[in-house]
Amino acid sequence: MQTSLDRTSTRSGIRLLLFAQGRANIEELAEQLRRHIQGLPGQHPAHLKVVPLEEHPYLAEHYKLVVTPALVKAEPLPAQVLAGEDLATQLEVWWPRWQGQAALVSYQEEAGQDPAPPPTTEALLQMSEEVFSLRQERAQLREQLDFKDRVLAMLVHDLRSPLTATALAVETLQQGREGSLDKAVERQLFEHARQQLRKMDSMITDILESARGSASELRIRAVETQLASLCQPVIEELLPRIQAKQLQFQADIPVDLPTVHVDPDKIRQVIFNLLDNAIKYTPAGGSIRLNILHRTSQKVQVTVSDTGPGIPEAEQENIFSDAVRLSRDQQQEGYGIGLSLCRRIVRAHYGQIWVESILGKGSSFHFTLPVYRLCGR
């Protein structure tokens, strides 16, 4: 007597499927059943296949499984389900009948009496995998559509403030066309309007960039995530370097911070990169701060601040561009590529990233992430 896990379909044999939860448990049970089957009499081989229940829910529905572990005799038809703890004893009881069914199928094949065979077990397994994959893709697409709806709502909310400020500046300029405003005030209003327009342009650009597929290129897998739990391993990993430079480090992460909708690995990479740069550029005895705040009902803001040399104002606009290196960085490793990747990751999460810096005093890198909300809430 032999058992097999190969994919060749022999309809005169006995095709068995073992369903259980947890790979470790199911493999141990499968090995016990293999040894038991080898001791049973019969001319028709048994092909035993392990089927993790969580990976084949459709197949479990097909065989109407209620209790696991379960052993399904899938072929010869009709299918039969054995369930419970003592599968070996039940198998021994039904084994003679299954051998008889296999013998009948073998006779029919030899006599040419079976012109239209039903789908094989392997075909059912493949269909189960495809259905499960389609269900996962449909759920992911639905989640992406819901998420993009929330992003549009966030964009409208964020655009309202600079749009209002621009409108007020233009209205004031229009009212002062008859000379009631002096030139200095006019220049200030024009500059304010230009700044707000640039801010709106940046917001729209971020959304358009993410819509071009940066999320799919980076393979973002967004889930509900606790930022505090995500940050802790990063801090622990970098702590020896912080202590080696005698830097003062402070993390301010509120306990009531809402969960965010992010890819944990990607956002961990962003936080690590920003903290790594802060350690690299902050002189010994300086300070670094990680701060997270609930900015609005829809956003969380993460800030990494340092007391390093700062970034020249003229170079702040391009600091997140691909492979941009500041004049101060020629002796340092990396930097430009890391910040470029940070921007791509944050944009793929429909967030924004920017820097505020004063030369000679330090820098603060900020980025926003979407708050996790259940659909319909």
From Swiss-Prot:
UniProtKB keywords: ATP-binding, Biological rhythms, Kinase, Nucleotide-binding, Phosphoprotein, Transferase, Two-component regulatory system
- InterPro entries hit by this protein: HATPase_C_sf (IPR036890), His_kinase_dom (IPR005467), HisK_dim/P_dom (IPR003661), HisK_dim/P_sf (IPR036097), KaiB_domain (IPR011649), Kinase_SasA (IPR023527), Sig_transdc_His_kin-like_C (IPR004358), Thioredoxin-like_sf (IPR036249)
Q: Which reaction does it catalyse?
A: ATP + protein L-histidine = ADP + protein N-phospho-L-histidine
Q: Does the keyword Phosphoprotein apply?
A: yes
Q: Which CDD domains match?
A: HisKA
Every copy of the Histidine kinase domain together lies at 154-373
The cross-references to SMART domains, in alphabetical order and at most eight, read: HATPase_c, HisKA, KaiB
Cysteines joined through disulfide linkages: none
Entry keyword Protease = no
Name the EC number(s): 2.7.13.3
**Broad EC category:** transferase
Listed under GO biological process in this entry are: circadian rhythm
Cited PROSITE patterns = HIS_KIN
**Domain notes, please?**
The N-terminus interacts with KaiC, while the C-terminal histidine kinase domain autophosphorylates and is probably responsible for self-oligomerization. The N-terminal domain stimulates the C-terminus to autophosphorylate.
Please give the subunit comment from the record: Homooligomerizes. Interacts with KaiC. Participates in the KaiABC clock complex, whose core is composed of a KaiC homohexamer, 6 KaiB and up to 6 KaiA dimers. SasA and KaiB(fs) compete to bind to KaiC.
Summarizing the function annotation, the protein's role is:
Member of the two-component regulatory system SasA/RpaA involved in genome-wide circadian gene expression. One of several clock output pathways. Participates in the Kai clock protein complex, the main circadian regulator in cyanobacteria, via its interaction with KaiC. KaiC enhances the autophosphorylation activity of SasA, which then transfers its phosphate group to RpaA to activate it. In addition to its output function, recruits fold-shifted KaiB (KaiB(fs)) to KaiC to cooperatively form the KaiB(6):KaiC(6) complex (independent of SasA kinase activity).
Q: What is this protein called?
A: Adaptive-response sensory kinase SasA
Q: From which source organism is this entry?
A: Synechococcus sp. (strain JA-3-3Ab)
